[in-house]
Amino acid sequence: MAFPGPRVLVVGSGIAGLGAAQKLCSHRAAPHLRVLEATASAGGRIRSERCFGGVVELGAHWIHGPSQDNPVFQLAAEFGLLGEKELSEENQLVDTGGHVALPSMIWSSSGTSVSLELMTEMARLFYGLIERTREFLNESETPMASVGEFLKKEISQQVASWTEDDEDTRKRKLAILNTFFNIECCVSGTHSMDLVALAPFGEYTVLPGLDCILAGGYQGLTDRILASLPKDTVAFDKPVKTIHWNGSFQEAAFPGETFPVLVECEDGARLPAHHVIVTVPLGFLKEHQDTFFEPPLPAKKAEAIKKLGFGTNNKIFLEFEEPFWEPDCQFIQVVWEDTSPLQDTALSLQDTWFKKLIGFLVQPSFESSHVLCGFIAGLESEFMETLSDEEVLLSLTQVLRRVTGNPQLPAAKSVRRSQWHSAPYTRGSYSYVAVGSTGDDLDLMAQPLPEDGTGTQLQVLFAGEATHRTFYSTTHGALLSGWREADRLVSLWDSQVEQSRPRL
């Protein structure tokens, strides 16, 4: 019985795994392909849910840099998932610098509004400093290790020049700057900018285009890719326990055929393969790498997994009977006036977790509901996951009553939130280059096994956002990484065909 082409297993059906599978299925080598998904649905950290009479994104929210060089944008356009505005050339040419737009409304913890003029001044200062971090790209030595340290040093010098401001104005400026630190924590998926390495920070590449959403849900994209695969390609509720590599494994159905890799699943299934593409999140690898690979990973790759950062950014959706914000409001920013990026306060998470919340995005396109989406990163975000829905709703009701100055503000009638740190096969949101690591570690993440080229080639390959040096933390980085590993296998198969041809 002849074997029908190379056997390939893809671990994980996020956009990296699905992208790799789609590309491989169309190759003339006709690989025998299966995707092993630990959960009951595809999409990974792309997770859309019908809720409140509309669609909420519990995972990926925007296409970042929706323009011609963004493969996620191109696929979404090809599948008809974008509107005229998103597809317009004007939208694609906008250069945001990767920075969050200024809010429509700014509320403070004293129940008063903050002037847009002051917010704009502080935004200009903060994002100017963020741009200056690029000066340290590729520097062998930097004056400090982290982005946070650099920002705080520069801000301290700026504070000294605020001689015409009274004490209250200086405090308010620092409180506003603190909200920008919290926003940047959400963007970077970290607890603190003190954890983010300064030298490689500028290596992350921002594509042009005004960030856009998929009105019908981001998961429409992964659903389309899934639908393009042959039936039953994806096995759901099939968590992998251990990947045995650099071996010689057999299967009764194919006597005489040996495979260098054996994937052992939690349900006891043992699946031999020629190649395995691992697309699981870095957070999962951090927790399980010691038992997930046998033999263990090479020391350099194992060290890269430990050194790179992987944090949590969660969303909290609140549904209201009636809106208490203006009709044209898009983003409400919250400023806690007793905070400052220059002060380290070790307060109880129980009492202060909500102060890490950056504010609320007004959700469009809901039939009859009025929905706000709050963003929160770091340890405070992880603590929030441990609370009940009722506790979260109560805390945020108190926050909103305080910042609006309206103690009678009606509570939200329901809440829905993400809990990415608690998700056993994810353990967080996305990666960042942490202090002690560099872009080289992202490249190490992408390096296939075995590394020395001995034995069977390309046994275990790696994809996912944490394997892309310049687009880490993004869906387009994840998709490109899946395509990269598929292309790596295709190149191998093509070279094998070429070598097997008789020479005249």
From Swiss-Prot:
Cofactor(s) for this UniProt protein: FAD
Leading EC class: oxidoreductase
Biological processes per GO annotation: polyamine catabolic process; positive regulation of spermidine biosynthetic process; putrescine biosynthetic process; putrescine catabolic process; spermidine catabolic process; spermine catabolic process
Positions contributing to substrate binding: H64, V187, N313
Keyword line: Cytoplasm, FAD, Flavoprotein, Oxidoreductase, Peroxisome
Reaction(s) catalysed (UniProt annotation): N(1)-acetylspermine + O2 + H2O = 3-acetamidopropanal + spermidine + H2O2; N(1)-acetylspermidine + O2 + H2O = 3-acetamidopropanal + putrescine + H2O2; N(1),N(12)-diacetylspermine + O2 + H2O = 3-acetamidopropanal + N(1)-acetylspermidine + H2O2
InterPro entries tied to this protein: Amino_oxidase (IPR002937), FAD/NAD-bd_sf (IPR036188), Flavin_monoamine_oxidase (IPR050281)
UniProt keyword Nucleus, yes or no: no
UniProt keyword Flavoprotein present: yes
Upregulating conditions: By polyamine analogs.
UniProt-annotated binding residues for FAD: A16, E37, R45, H61, W62, V240, E465, T474, T475
Cofactor note: Binds 1 FAD per subunit.
Compartment(s) of residence: Peroxisome; Cytoplasm
Record's GO cellular component terms: peroxisomal matrix
EC number(s) stated in the UniProt entry for this protein: 1.5.3.13
A Pfam family it matches: Amino_oxidase
Tissue/organ expression: Widely expressed at different developmental stages. Expressed at high level in the liver and the stomach, expressed at lower level in heart, spleen, thymus, small intestine, muscle, pancreas, uterus, and breast and expressed at very low level in brain, kidney, lung, testis, skin, adrenal gland and prostate gland.
GO molecular function, one term: polyamine oxidase activity
Pathway: Amine and polyamine metabolism; spermine metabolism
Microbody targeting signal (motif): residue ranges: 502-504
Quaternary organization: Monomer.
Similarity comment: Belongs to the flavin monoamine oxidase family.
Known role: Flavoenzyme which catalyzes the oxidation of N(1)-acetylspermine to spermidine and is thus involved in the polyamine back-conversion. Can also oxidize N(1)-acetylspermidine to putrescine. Substrate specificity: N(1)-acetylspermine = N(1)-acetylspermidine > N(1),N(12)-diacylspermine >> spermine. Does not oxidize spermidine. Plays an important role in the regulation of polyamine intracellular concentration and has the potential to act as a determinant of cellular sensitivity to the antitumor polyamine analogs.
Leftover remarks: Oxidizes N(1)-acetylated polyamines on the exo-side of their N(4)-amino groups. Plant PAO oxidizes spermine on the endo-side of the N(4)-nitrogen.
Name of the protein: Peroxisomal N(1)-acetyl-spermine/spermidine oxidase
Naturally occurring in which organism (per UniProt): Mus musculus
Gene expressing this chain: Paox
